[in-house]
Amino acid sequence: MKIRVLHLGKYYPPHTGGIEIYLQQLVTHQSKGMDVTAIVANDLRRTQVEFLDGAKITRVATFGAIASMPITPTMAWHIRQSKADIVHLHTPNPGAALALLASGHPGKLIITHHADTLGRKQLRRISDPFVRAAMERASAIIVTSKRYLESSEELASFRDKCRIIPLGIDTAPFANLKTTESAYIRTEYGERLILSVGRLVPYKGFEYLIQSMKNVDGTLLLVGTGYLQRELQRCIQECSVQDKVHLLGHVDDIAPYYRASSIFVLPSITRAEAFGVVQMEAMASGIPIVNTDIPSGVPEVSVHGQTGLTVPPEDPVALAQAINLLLDNDTLRQQLGAAARKRVQDEFSAEKMVERTLKLYEEVMAESV
């Protein structure tokens, strides 16, 4: 008999984000051997049901948001209708945690804790009790890196039930060699390309990367959207790097940009960047990484001196030095890029992630026999 799994997420693709990519990878691979459904928030004030990636995806009616958390009053009812053996909750997601507790669903609970809840203290006082209650009820909590587990306040009381399962990606779309599209990008922007991808929000640290470009002989392509766009445009002008830095906004197909680039930079400044899926995509494309030494999984994914270079956060000078070292040393850049691709294939593939998650499911199910 197939294991029945219900995923509770914040959103599901085409919404973009690291958690959404992770959820889609699990759903796509698990649906080949399990009965998989997912309940997430919708953009609309009505519920929509779709069949995607081999699974039933229910996007429940959403009535606004509080501190970026969607308000989904009917989610508990939808959870209650599920016959799942395992409920897999993806946090931070206080609304889904509350809905699950309110539903009284009897299934075994597994949580993937992507990051600690961020936000105003007043809202945390409301949300923390039921997030904690969900963790107390959980049979196991998946954490994506040892470093994040060690630094997490929310997980401090639950370390005995935590399991380290790194995120994984489908490496195939990024494994191709240079393409016509990537050649066109290099023709348009130049040969010494630096790429960075992410939402334009404070913890990403993009202002420090822009500042570093004052001392870099190359071109930065910054892909992503967010409310800091105007502020970053001002930063570009103040640093007089208009000819070196291009804000590209949303890009439908990011793979050619990875292939066209010489270096990928993840300049995040806080542990809100828990893992950095985009750096795995860049590594799968065979390019070296410049990342920052923050207390999360970021420097565990791309290791300093092995697959890239790690520098202190909020340090434009160190960023510039690392970028220049890689741009000016073809041999080092190629060696680190090749090692980066191998590391992702060996340790961070979607297949490896799904395999480890299934093993945990089976352990949890065996406990109830």
Task: Report the location of each language-model feature.
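N-terminal strand-loop element at the rim of the active site
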Residues: H7-T16, I21-A67
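Active-site donor-binding acidic/aromatic loop of nucleotide-activated sugar
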Residues: L228-E231, Q242-V251, Y257, L309-T310
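Acidic donor-binding loop of glycosyltransferase active sites
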Residues: R259-A274, I287
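Conserved acidic donor-binding segment of nucleotide-sugar-dependent glycosyltransferases
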Residues: V303-G305, L309-P316, L325-T331
